[in-house]
Amino acid sequence: MTKRTESKYKINRRLGVNLWGRPKSPINKREYGPGQHGQRRKKPSDFGVQLMAKQKLRGYYGNISEKQFYKYYEEAVRRRGDTSENLIELLERRLDAVVYRMKFAITPFAARQFVSHGHVLVNGRRVNISSYQVRDGDVVEVREKSKQLAMVLDSVQSAERDVPEYIEVDHRAMKGTFARAPKLADVPYPVQMEPNLVVEFYSR
């Protein structure tokens, strides 16, 4: 088991939820945190509830760094409209998130690595920055040389997840389009996400 995989499962155990809905996650058997005292759970304070909401959202998108996550919050505040909805939109526009939604990778962690290794094209050009912001109408596809990779084929054929309505994808061509910006209600999170609590956490 790699360190990346270990950290992924520790995130699930620490937060007490199966963030990505994976059937083999250890949290399905042990609903408490890692370590000797993992079974001790106290009723969280308001701060604790807000912190948990932030950690869940950060963790879901591949455990984004706190610095980068806070930048998303700042950008969400600057934009017009509901800050919590803006935050979700910014996260869902990440290239690795779009690759994950198109089912070209089995987890957000795998999607980030897939992008950084240069396997993905956006509008015909290779982009290896996982945080790249995909725009409405952008075409995202797997490079020709990468279409037969086992990890891609396994993910596409997996029945674990469905492609959301704001994504259009042709799995035979390994190509898809980011059709529109999603709202929170559109995003198929396996667990409840509360971006409003994230906003409360940062605006304290």
Curated annotation (Swiss-Prot):
Residue ranges constituting the S4 RNA-binding domain according to the UniProt record: 93-156
Keywords: Ribonucleoprotein, Ribosomal protein, RNA-binding, rRNA-binding
Listed Gene3D superfamilies: Ribosomal Protein S4 Delta 41, Chain A, domain 1, RNA-binding S4 domain
Top-level lineage group: Bacteria
Region spans: Disordered: 21-45
GO CC, any one term: small ribosomal subunit
PROSITE patterns attached to this UniProt entry: RIBOSOMAL_S4 (PS00632), S4 (PS50889)
Residue ranges the record marks as coiled coil: none
Pfam families: Ribosomal_S4, S4
Gene Ontology MF annotations: rRNA binding; structural constituent of ribosome
GO biological process assignments: ribosomal small subunit biogenesis; translation
HAMAP family reported for this sequence: Ribosomal_uS4_B (MF_01306_B)
Similarity comment text for this entry: Belongs to the universal ribosomal protein uS4 family.
Role: One of the primary rRNA binding proteins, it binds directly to 16S rRNA where it nucleates assembly of the body of the 30S subunit.
Protein name per UniProt: Small ribosomal subunit protein uS4
Gene coding for it: rpsD
